[in-house]
């Protein structure tokens, strides 16, 4: 099995993140080292060397398959799609910018 892999029943469509708000933004790595962000990491709390509209990302994560990540090489700029966090919408730990309800 591949991390994040989903094996749906034969003939049934796979539907992920349906109905959740998404947004696309441009992210630049202003640092001198690569930064990798995992699929379920609260994007608002990513490394400070990543430059983007941080306030717009509160309550969002990368819209990529579970168990995968996006790597931002030093000096790179790329566009990413984010999806709203679901469930209880509570975030704890990470960089301690929320530590509670969104």
From Swiss-Prot:
Keywords: Cytoplasm, Hydrolase. It is found in: Cytoplasm. Pathway: Nitrogen metabolism; urea degradation; CO(2) and NH(3) from urea (urease route): step 1/1. One of its GO terms (biological process) is urea catabolic process. The keyword ATP-binding does not apply. GO terms for molecular function: urease activity. Its EC number is 3.5.1.5. The keyword Acyltransferase does not apply. InterPro entries: Urease_beta-like (IPR002019), Urease_betasu_sf (IPR036461), Urease_subunit (IPR050069). Belongs to the urease beta subunit family. This is Urease subunit beta. It comes from Opitutus terrae (strain DSM 11246 / JCM 15787 / PB90-1).
């Amino acid at each position: 099995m591949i991390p994040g892999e989903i094996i749906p029943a034969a003939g049934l469509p796979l539907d992920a993140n349906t109905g959740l708000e998404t947004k696309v933004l441009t992210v630049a790595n202003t640092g001198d080292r690569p930064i990798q962000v995992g699929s379920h990491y609260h994007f608002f709390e990513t490394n400070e060397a990543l430059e983007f509209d941080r306030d717009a990302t509160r309550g969002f994560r990368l819209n990529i398959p579970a168990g995968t990540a996006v790597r931002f090489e030093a000096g790179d700029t790329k566009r990413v799609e984010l999806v709203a966090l679901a469930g209880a919408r509570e975030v704890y730990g990470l960089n301690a910018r929320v530590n509670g309800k969104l």
